[in-house]
Structures are given as structure tokens and as C-alpha cells.
């Protein structure tokens, strides 16, 4: 029961969720863990009630994502809906958990309507200090392609380097989104570990 309670309050976020591949895997993992608990309790106790409607509970409480692309956000919602859809059961409104916005920028002057305030958008998460798990595969974008936001990045990110790839800023943002006991896992190229432009993000990670 303690493990179940821990699972039910776990918060998992992909700050560049795209069409939801990582969020779907997180959903699958959590469903599997709850199923395992039900099976174990049945085996040990000789019976028992399964947790009702666990898929919807997970979607409402455990899974969070943000992406800049509106179409990707809608696809992510749809893929999660399809994974949990059952006859005669109302689908979740995932707009509270899966949102469209610029994960890196909270300034409307810079990002317009896509400016994203994490603490405002997910207050229930940040009341507890942040997300328990941050996962994803951030966008790899060469610095020449986002010159217009560099002044903001320089002012707001410790990892700033004029030739750094966009994914380095996602690393810093992801780390800052976690609570003090959080876990962080991104798929990343290893160039930042040796390249000059990675010096500042290496300091952030340490």
C-alpha cells in the first residue's frame, strides 16, 4: 500500500513532449506497476479488489508534458486517450496536464502567446517543489537558428554560451523543474561533455 501511495503521487514531465512517445512509455510503466501490485495482493491475500479506473487516475495525476508545436500536443493527447479508452467511459480532459508553450521562455515579449510560466501552469506540482521525474528527448537546434531569443537565454540561463545548441538550455530547464529528490533522464548527444560550448552546462550539472 505504501508503494501504491507513492506511485499515485509521482509526477512525471517531458518538457519537449512532441507527440507523446515518452509520456506513453511512462503511462505504460505506471499501469504495469499498479497491475503488479493488484496481482501480488491477490496472490498473497487470496483475493482483493483491483484499483478502479487506474488509467484515468494516472493521466490526471502523474503525467505532464509541454511542447511548442500545437499539432504535436494534440497528437500527444490523442495517443494517451487511445491508450486508455474503454467502452462507456468518458475520456479525460488532458488540457490541464499536456500543454502548448515555450518550455524555455516565460516572457511574452520574447515568446508571445507561447510564453510559458511553469509555476502558474502546474501549481499543484510546484507546491511540492517540482516534478519527481523529468524525461525526454529535447530538440537539437544549432545556435544560428535561434538568434532572436539569445538575449533572453543569456540573461536567464547559467549555461548560456553564444554557440551552444538549444538542447543545453533544455538540460538546465529540466534540472530546475525537478524537486530536490527528483530524477532526470534525457536522450542527448555527448558533444556537450567535451565541447567548449558545453563548459557552462557541465558546471550546472555538477
PLM segments and residue spans:
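SAM-dependent methyltransferase catalytic region
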Residues: 1-206
Amino acid at each position: 500500500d505504501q508503494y501504491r501511495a507513492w506511485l499515485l503521487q509521482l509526477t512525471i514531465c517531458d518538457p519537449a513532449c512532441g507527440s507523446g512517445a515518452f509520456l506513453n512509455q511512462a503511462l505504460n510503466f505506471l499501469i504495469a506497476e499498479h497491475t503488479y501490485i493488484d496481482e501480488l495482493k491477490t496472490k498473497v491475500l487470496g483475493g482483493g479488489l483491483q484499483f478502479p479506473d487506474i488509467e484515468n487516475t494516472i493521466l490526471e495525476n502523474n503525467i505532464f508534458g509541454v511542447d511548442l508545436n500545437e499539432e504535436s500536443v494534440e497528437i500527444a493527447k490523442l495517443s494517451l486517450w487511445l491508450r486508455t479508452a474503454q467502452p462507456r467511459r468518458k475520456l479525460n480532459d488532458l488540457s490541464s496536464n499536456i500543454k502548448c508553450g515555450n518550455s524555455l521562455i516565460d516572457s511574452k515579449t520574447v515568446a508571445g502567446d507561447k510564453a510559458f510560466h511553469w509555476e502558474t501552469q502546474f501549481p499543484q506540482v510546484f507546491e511540492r517543489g517540482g516534478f519527481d521525474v523529468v524525461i525526454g528527448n529535447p530538440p537539437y537546434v544549432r545556435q544560428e537558428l535561434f538568434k532572436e531569443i539569445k538575449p533572453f537565454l543569456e540573461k536567464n540561463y547559467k549555461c548560456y554560451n553564444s554557440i551552444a545548441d538549444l538542447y543545453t538550455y533544455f538540460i538546465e530547464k529540466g534540472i530546475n523543474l525537478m524537486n530536490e529528490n527528483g530524477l532526470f533522464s534525457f536522450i542527448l548527444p555527448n558533444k556537450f561533455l567535451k565541447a567548449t560550448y558545453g563548459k557552462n552546462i557541465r558546471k550546472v550539472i555538477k
